[in-house]
């Protein structure tokens, strides 16, 4: 239940800015999770197949899809390349396509010609750099056999979309996060008091110290 709450809250938070980009992060999440499954299937096909068949209906579906894809006889490295091309392709299109297209059009106009295309004003999805590299790091770690494939798409999606770090970072490695979602978390007053103490101390330094000396620093 806790994981569902975190995931739904994260998607609401992300979609509040522009719901159209929810499809992008969901698609990237599902594909990279499946690429991790596909890579793992190469190493242990029988164990992975049994794990999928004994799982949820969604896991059984992706298990059968992976068995079909495995018949294509693609190498593990090729699957990793698929993942990287997809992720970097999305990132490059949304973040850099408009920049290069506008500059190329300006250069052509300086040469006395008229560009034959209309430059696109592409909106940059919030946090695309963070969740792209975070998702890629998972696939790369699975490929290097430094991390086991995560059988729960729910946990993996929460790892990618968790709203506290989605739009401002830092980029979190799957090995440092996913195992925590399986731990039994209990409310702890000592941790609460310690955390609130840090928050209040930060407010004090910002309001009482930083804001007070800011006018003098600006004049220097």
Residue positions per predicted region:
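Membrane-embedded transmembrane alpha-helical bundles that form the catalytic cores
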Residues: 1-220
